[in-house]
Amino acid sequence: MPPGSWWLVLWLPPLATLPAGAVPQEEAAMSVPRCKSLKETDLIKTSVSDCYCYNQHSQIEWTYMWSTVQVTVTSPGLLSIVYITGRHTCQHTETILSFLKCVTHNFWTAEEAKEVTIVFSPYGETVCFSVKPVGSLLTYAVSVNRNVVDFRLFLVFATGIFLFFYAKTLSQSPVFYYSSGTVLGILMTLVFVLLMTKKHIPKYSTFGALMIGCWFASVYVLCQLMENLKWLWCGNRIYVLGYVLVVGLCSFSACYSRGPPADEGSRDLLMWALRFLSLVLVYTGMAISQFAYAVMILLLLSWTRHYLLRAFSCLRWKVRQWFATRALVVRYLTDDEYREQAEAETASALEELRQACCRPDFPSWLAVSRLQAPKKFAEFVLGASHLSPEEVSTHEKQYGLGGAFLEEQLFSLQTESLPAS
């Protein structure tokens, strides 16, 4: 594999995965034959610890691009969910990206709760899980609902589209810089502090390792807070508001002291980061991965269309130069050039006529018999001018400057330009 292409391992294998219901998912489902099959709008109430499987749809429909399946397990007492097959077991993952997603999900999944909600795509792999009540067996309910349009999923997709097309504008906006910095400081304090202290870290490798650790830690804390958001807001509202106010002011002060990026390199880096984030949001905001890949490719093509058009126009211009014949360039003569060429061509033609008349085979008697002025023709053959002084004077009076022909042309143009009465 050439250097710099290692990231393809994370993305190319999902393109070749089999659709839901293919051999890998069927084998996984057959490994737990006693599990009950779940369908949409199912409502199961039982007090027996059992396992359940939801078989994914094999036929893809474009109307369900933002649909999700929600399985809710509720009980008066504590219960736990154990995944048997699927992406949450981390045993049959084919790519590094799938393994990281599996480990991350299992890392912040709540182990014990009275209500557990599982949300997944209806076009993924088969999901099997078992419900194990903690302590004494109590009656619990398993309900399955399908959201045709999950507005949270659609909101993530729309946000990705907006970020992609307005990444350059947002990277140059001071308002976006201060607002995004404040929000980042509130939601991901560790990442914000690391970015503020970047200049004090000499090695990029150390900074990269710290960034990965701070990012995963911030995501874990954020997911834990989102799961307990209702409890935090009801019981600790004052502390939540105090944290948001204090950390928000500190984050805004830090961003204000540093100021928005002034150099072009920092702005370009922020623009590329926003566009990469937009592609991630587009991918995570669609339930069908094939459609997500198609939208991402269309976005990249729309972004690079002016580069492609410019390259195509340059190629077409080169090909036209190679194969097309050069067009003739026509230049019009000036009055002086026209007069000079006319005099030269006339003198050359008259000289050719003299030479032709001096040839032995020239029928001189026949020519003399047809001429009105044979003496003038003989003088012309011997070297005299072909025009007499009287003819030259008459021509100048008729066609020269101030002549009758020129005056007639001028007066006729003026008459045509006058409006009709």
UniProtKB/Swiss-Prot annotation:
Keyword Nucleus: yes
Domain of life: Eukaryota
UniProt membrane topology term: Multi-pass membrane protein
Transmembrane feature ranges: 147-167, 175-195, 206-226, 232-252, 279-299
Localization per record: Nucleus inner membrane
Protein keywords: Membrane, Nucleus, Signal, Transmembrane, Transmembrane helix
Signal peptide: 1-22
InterPro entries found in the cross-reference section: NEMP_fam
Pfam families assigned to the protein according to its UniProt record, in alphabetical order: NEMP (PF10225)
UniProt xrefs under PANTHER family: AT07567P-RELATED, NUCLEAR ENVELOPE INTEGRAL MEMBRANE PROTEIN 2
Listed name of the protein: Nuclear envelope integral membrane protein 2
Organism: Rattus norvegicus
